[in-house]
Amino acid sequence: YYFEKEPLGNAGALFKLKDKLTEDFLLLNADAIFDIDFNRFIKYHKEKGGLVTLFTHPNSHPYDSGLIFADTNNTVLRWSAKEDERPAYYRNRVNAGLHVISPNILETEITTAKVDLDRQLLKPLAGSGKMFCYDSPEYVKDMGTPDRYVAVCRDYREGKVSGKNLKNKQKAIFLDRDGTLNK
């Protein structure tokens, strides 16, 4: 653990722990509830070999979330923060706040003690070929507002949180080209 005497932002403490972080690590936002297959997420990160892998998915509030634009290989090309100008039409793919990060990212030149993870470390990696997105239907929800917290509590009680974990069998319907249901 690292105890901050002064607030260091959501990534400043990482630089204080730089010598202790010797292998890829998970960085998880504290205002999210999730139930995901971490082994699958980490395996994907290792296969891609980037500095960072973002857990991405569509959400109910892309207007106040970081939009992620990627190529067909899921290499992140552009990161549009909520305050950035956005195109009129975009894919609802957002950073869910779960990350697998290589300690090599801490070689980034940072001149301030207070560090913003998204703006100072992640967003500048977009387009470098070193950051990938992991698209998943698993349950990850930001519960940082009262309405979102109420929705997450309801989803938890109804079993939606654990039910979407990819370790569990998922229901699916397959249609052939003429729209016929197949068993």
Residue ranges, per PLM feature:
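Active-site neighborhood of HAD-like aspartate-dependent phosphohydrolases
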Residues: K171-A172, R177-K183
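Long, charged amphipathic helices and adjacent flexible linkers at domain junctions
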Residues: S162-F174
